């Protein structure tokens, strides 16, 4: 497992780590301090994942903008 402040190597690894954190938090077995640390790491991973998704979306838009015949509907995240 990567160090707490280290970014995972890929989006998929970050997502996997985030899922593990959620499972541990949902178990309710963690001491308060450890749960807070896990929650903090989870927030970091979620933000990093969101940033990677936004970068991927921008790349797709750039690639599609090279082809003027292709239109891309605006992206609207479900949570907004």
Swiss-Prot record:
Main localization of the protein described in the UniProt heading: cytoplasm
Subcellular location: Cytoplasm
Enzyme class per UniProt: hydrolase
Matching Pfam families: Exonuc_VII_S
Listed EC numbers: 3.1.11.6
Domain of life: Bacteria
Catalytic activity: Exonucleolytic cleavage in either 5'- to 3'- or 3'- to 5'-direction to yield nucleoside 5'-phosphates
Record-level GO cellular component terms: cytosol; exodeoxyribonuclease VII complex
Keyword line: Cytoplasm, Exonuclease, Hydrolase, Nuclease
GO molecular function, one term: exodeoxyribonuclease VII activity
Entry keyword Zinc-finger: no
Record flagged with keyword Cytoplasm: yes
Any Gene Ontology biological process: DNA catabolic process
NCBIfam families: PRK00977.1-1, PRK00977.1-4, xseB
Subunit: Heterooligomer composed of large and small subunits.
Matches recorded under HAMAP family: Exonuc_7_S
Function of the protein: Bidirectionally degrades single-stranded DNA into large acid-insoluble oligonucleotides, which are then degraded further into small acid-soluble oligonucleotides.
Family from the record: Belongs to the XseB family.
Name the record gives this protein: Exodeoxyribonuclease 7 small subunit
Organism encoding this protein: Shigella sonnei (strain Ss046)
Name of encoding gene: xseB
């Amino acid at each position: 497992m990567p160090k707490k402040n280290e970014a995972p190597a890929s989006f998929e690894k970050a997502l996997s780590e985030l899922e593990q954190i959620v499972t541990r938090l949902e178990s309710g077995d963690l001491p308060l301090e450890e749960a807070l640390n896990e929650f903090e790491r989870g927030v970091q991973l979620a933000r990093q994942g969101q940033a990677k998704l936004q970068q991927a979306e921008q790349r797709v838009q750039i690639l599609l903008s090279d082809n003027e015949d292709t239109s891309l509907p605006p992206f609207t995240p479900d949570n907004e």
